[in-house]
Amino acid sequence: MKALVVIDYTFDFVEGRLPVGQPAIAIEDRIAAVTRQFVKQGDFVVMAVDVHDEQDALHPEHKLFPPHNIRGTSGRELYGKLSEVYEAEKERIYWMDKTRYSAFAGTDLDLQLRMRAVQEIHLVGVCTDICVLHTAVDAYNRGFRIVVHADCAASFNPQGHEWALQHFQRSLGAELRIDDQPITI
């Protein structure tokens, strides 16, 4: 079985408090289409969504980034068309809060994947070189086959985005896809 993990495609990361901006806006249609496709196929779909408490001065990101994805705020809402897909299909999509870069860190993601005998994980979302990267590394270390949809990933750092795509392919053995077609970088 396959799984799609949609990482941090929220208002705060697209246009809000820690915005990727235009690169994230540009993937809106594609990320919604890929999510719809996985739901339709009956694959396991996970919304891995960053959550923070504004007063948590001990969280390591507190020193690195402005407050973002604060619990109970509109910044944590899924962005645009992905929000529409989620609302229409939420009974078939697993929502998972995460507090670290990797969707595996401190969550039950590994357990959820193993219970469903998932062997192949497809990754989409933001930021390519932060949360998508750390999730991919943890997936690799757990023995999952990794597919990254390059046309569904974005970062506020263009060089970091390109570096991460190369790292996925060259160091993690991940398959990269654009329009569902494998590519080589």
Task: Describe each PLM feature range.
Residues D50-H52, R100-Y101:
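Short glycine-enriched loops at secondary-structure junctions
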Residues R17-A24, K63-N69, T99:
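Short glycine-enriched, charge-decorated loop/helix-capping segments at active-site entrances
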Residues D56-P60:
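Metal-dependent catalytic neighborhoods of phosphoester/phosphodiester hydrolases
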Residues M1-A3, A33-Q41, P66-I185:
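Active-site-adjacent betaalpha module
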Residues F11, D53, A154:
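Short, glycine/acidic-enriched loop or turn micro-motifs at the edges of active sites
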Residues R17-D50:
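A short alpha/beta connector and helix-capping loop motif
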Residues L4-Y9:
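N-terminal nucleotide-binding beta1-loop-alpha1 segment
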Residues T10-G16:
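Short acidic, Gly/Ser-rich segments with clustered Asp/Glu that frequently serve as metal-coordination loops
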